[in-house]
Curated annotation (Swiss-Prot):
The keyword Cell membrane does not apply. This is Integrator complex assembly factor BRAT1. Belongs to the BRAT1 family. Component of a multiprotein complex required for the assembly of the RNA endonuclease module of the integrator complex. Associates with INTS9 and INTS11 in the cytoplasm and blocks the active site of INTS11 to inhibit the endonuclease activity of INTS11 before formation of the full integrator complex. Following dissociation of WDR73 of the complex, BRAT1 facilitates the nuclear import of the INTS9-INTS11 heterodimer. In the nucleus, INTS4 is integrated to the INTS9-INTS11 heterodimer and BRAT1 is released from the mature RNA endonuclease module by inositol hexakisphosphate (InsP6). Disulfide bonds: none annotated. The keyword Nuclease does not apply. InterPro entries: ARM-like, ARM-type_fold, BRAT1.
Length: 823
């Protein structure tokens, strides 16, 4: 510990021990505890206490009957655990009876402070810290702490209850590390005392008729098998598995969700051989005993396992598919035909679960669709995969929700009434349908997919979120449409669908709901980016009003829509698909180009989102050599940087630096790698003098923009500028000739201006800079040091331990105002 901190520590301990003093907030106490943890991890806790006796006095003061702050008491309990984690310091604290009086029945356990959850939490965390050596185990057994931990598992505070369960797992693991001659015996008498007590309590809880106690026991076991993988865990499972299996004989099965978590934790544990401990049989029995809602997560977990018997995988997949099989069975006209894999025809239990209420029906279907969506991309997904049946089920669900299905059975009509207009199922089914686009399907089913998507996009009843997901699913299915080898154009079926879709998109772009307009523009941007160069798509799009509407939406009252319109316009313009109508200001026929429109938005829009979108478009245009840019690249870059430098949004300024970097790379050129198989080496163009190469950068005032950004008040902008200038300096250093390196122009005026900028006075511009001056300034600047300073947190000075102690003392007036840092 620093001498300065040692001098401040006695005063701070006196403040903490005095209940009359105003107490520092929890953040200060947490930082103080972290500091002590750092000290004890690096050195001796015993030496720390001996050199700073005020710490022991503080802990002893907690034992006096007084009106202590619960926060300070909790802090002291945790601090004691930090010190006692080292065995020699533990023995030192034991000699003074400090540990039994703090953590035993004579301590906070019997006082009024125990009613505060923060004290109970501090007690648990203190024990968690000190339980690291054999002496701690004997202490826990002797002071009765384990029994208290058992009771805290049912604490009213969820944080305390969870911490108690985790502490039991930690103590159990520490106890079982004792035997060095192999795993412990199955005989109860051979288990260490603490471990035996915990396992006995778990056994008693599993035999209990009270569901909360069963849940607590299952949660402890789940954490144990999830974190402990030593051989003794197999012994533990063999001992307790009959009691776990016995839970399946109860009706209903208690704590089903916790039981599922435990079984999956055991199945994933590398310390267990599932085939030799009866786990597969227990999993199969559990699948058959749980309700469909409870069994879904278990079935998904089983199917995610790498090594699992095929029969169990088939059973789990059948359980997962049952709700969708019921949907198909209830709506199909062919009796008994669900189309799913064997064993999923839709048993009576699942039908009863689906139909009683809308909440049960919707919840089960949404969970089933989510589970299948997670399973689809996995390499261990079941094979064969019933792609056609799942497509049919997803389409049927969407039709039921839309009211376009015509079920003939009573169950089907009931299901239709439950799902009609259900947005939750619509969203889940559209997500699942989009994921299914990764596979193939019969042509007639694909036609149904496009039909139901078009139905949703057309329907006035579709909510904005449903429409967004319908657009997303539509794009994914268009991407997956069959293609002719060597041709990326849309196939005839997709093209026919597109011609029906564009009028719908036109209508959605005119929607009074801004979320719908925004989703339509995002969809248009995706479509144009993918098929903008294809003749069939171009012809269909230009024959519609979509480009004109997109241009009009650049002036939408909602900023999110304007931003999406900017992105769509950028994509349309890149593909030559923009239609520029006469502007309202020039009715005689003068037209505005997309570049002029977006520059106007960058200069005048009152919201940040459209301006950011414009900067992204400009950067992409420069990178792709857009037609409007290559005509006069320097004028384009200079104009954009001039506007961006004055923008109040730091993201716009940062994107301006990205554009500057692209221009810099294009101007100086990136060294390319010659083809190793070329017959003759490529002809290298003679390199231009460095000063000549930098002239375009000077003409667009790129350096003034970068230097100004270097002292930006927003750190991300300054960091990006620093990286750009470091890149430029490295680039020029490798390209400059010895003669250029020896040139030493007068840079005093530029450096003086930069110093004023750094001080906050950026009113005076740098003016025209010559390349030689720029190179000299770059060589003289400590950019590496600046980058290091920018990488530090804004409060790195005030985060020191000395500053923390001063601030805590200043809150009670012990230090003068000028002696404390503010952070």
């Amino acid at each position: 510990m620093d001498p300065e901190c040692s001098q401040l520590l006695p005063a701070l301990c006196a403040v903490l021990a005095d209940p009359r003093q105003p107490m520092a907030d929890d953040t200060c106490l947490e930082k103080l505890l972290d500091w002590f943890k750092t000290i004890t991890e690096a050195g001796s806790s015993l030496l720390l206490l001996q050199e700073n006796p005020c710490l022991v006095e503080l802990l002893c003061h907690m034992l006096k009957p007084q009106d202590l702050s619960s926060r300070v008491l909790s802090f002291s309990l945790r601090l004691t655990g930090v010190f006692a984690a080292q065995e020699d310091c533990f023995q030192y604290l034991q000699q003074g009876e400090l540990l039994p009086r703090l953590f035993g029945e004579a301590g906070p356990l019997g006082g009024a402070a125990w009613t505060a959850p923060t004290v109970r939490s501090g007690w648990i965390q203190g024990l968690r810290s000190l339980a690291r050596h054999p002496s701690a185990l004997h202490f826990l057994a002797d002071c009765g702490a384990v029994d208290t931990i058992f009771s805290l598992q049912g604490d009213s505070s969820l944080f305390v209850a969870s911490a108690a369960g985790q502490l039991l797992v930690h103590i159990l693991g520490l106890s079982m590390q004792g035997p060095a001659d192999g795993p412990p015996s199955l005989q109860a008498g051979d288990w260490p005392a603490c471990a035996q007590k915990i396992v006995d309590h778990i056994e008693e809880s599993l035999r209990s008729a009270a569901t909360p106690q069963i849940t607590q026991a299952l949660n402890v076991l789940t954490t144990t098998f999830g974190h402990c993988h030593d051989p003794w865990t197999r012994v533990l499972w063999v001992r307790l598995s009959p009691l776990v299996a016995g839970l399946l004989e109860k009706d209903p099965v208690p704590a089903a969700h916790s039981l599922v978590d435990l079984l999956l934790s055991v199945a994933r544990s590398p310390g267990l051989s599932s085939s030799s401990c009866g786990l597969w049989e227990t999993l199969a029995q559990t699948l058959s005993r749980l309700s469909p809602t409870q069994a879904g997560p278990l079935a998904l977990g089983i199917l995610k396992l790498q090594d699992c018997p095929q029969a169990l995988r088939a059973q789990a997949f059948a359980v997962l598919l049952q709700p969708l099989a019921c949907v198909l069975k209830a709506t199909t006209q062919a009796p008994g035909a669900s189309g799913m894999v064997d064993g999923t025809a839709g048993d009576s239990v699942t039908v009863d679960t689906l139909l009683p209420s809308k909440a049960a029906c919707v919840g089960l279907l949404c969970r089933t669709l989510a589970h299948l969506e997670l399973l689809l991309p996995l390499p261990q997904r079941p094979c064969p995969w019933p792609q056609a049946s799942l497509l049919g089920a997803a389409v049927t669900l969407l039709q039921l929700c839309q009211g376009s299905a015509s079920p003939t059975s009573d169950a089907g009509r009931h299901l239709c009434a439950l799902l009609l207009g259900c947005v939750r199922v619509q969203r889940a089914a559209l997500d699942f349908l989009g994921t299914l686009s990764q596979g193939t399907g019969p042509p007639e089913l694909v036609t149904e997919v496009f039909a139901v998507l078009l139905e949703y996009l057309r329907s006035p009843d579709s909510s904005p979120t449903v429409l967004k997901k319908a657009f997303q699913a539509t794009f994914r299915w268009l991407l997956s449409s069959p293609k002719t080898p060597g041709c990326w154009d849309l196939d005839p079926q997709a093209l026919l669908f597109l011609r029906e879709l564009l009028p719908v998109l036109q209508k959605r772009l005119c929607s009074p709901c801004w979320e719908v307009r925004d989703s339509g523009l995002e969809f248009l941007t995706q479509m144009t980016g993918r098929w903008g160069g294809q003749a069939s798509f171009r012809h269909a799009l230009l024959a519609s009003e979509v480009p004109k509407l997109t241009e009009q939406l650049l002036r939408d009252p909602e900023s999110y829509v304007r931003a999406s319109a900017v992105a769509a316009t950028g994509q349309l313009s890149s593909q030559g698909l923009c239609v520029s109508p006469a502007s309202p200001e020039h009715l005689g026929g003068q037209q505005k180009s997309p570049l002029s429109e977006l520059l106007h938005i960058l200069s005048t829009d009152s919201e940040g989102f459209p301006r950011r979108a414009a900067m992204h478009v400009f950067t992409q245009w420069l990178r792709d050599s857009h037609a409007d840019v290559v005509g006069d690249t320097e004028e384009f870059v200079a104009g954009v940087l001039q506007v961006a430098s004055q923008d109040l949004d730091w993201e716009v300024r940062a994107q301006g630096l990205e554009l500057a970097l692209v221009f810099l790379e294009q101007t100086l050129g990136q060294p390319g790698s010659p083809c190793p198989y070329a017959v003759t080496p490529p002809v290298v163009a003679p390199a231009r003098p460095l000063a000549q190469a930098l002239q375009p950068l000077c003409r667009v005032r790129l350096f003034e923009f970068a230097f100004r950004a270097l002292f930006d008040c927003d750190r991300p902008v300054a960091q990006k500028s620093c990286d750009l200038l470091l890149f430029l300096r490295a680039k020029t250093a490798s390209s400059s000739s010895p003669q250029e390196a020896r040139i030493s122009p007068d840079v005093a005026s530029v450096e003086a201006a930069l110093q004023r900028w750094q001080a906050g006075d950026q009113a005076q511009p740098l003016g025209d800079l010559e390349p030689e001056v720029v190179l000299a300034v770059l060589r003289s600047m400590d950019l590496e040091g600046l980058r290091g300073a920018l990488a530090e947190s804004s409060d790195h000075v005030e985060k020191s331990p000395q500053s923390l102690l001063q601030d805590m003392l200043a809150t009670v007036g012990i230090l003068g105002e000028n002696e404390a840092d503010c952070y």
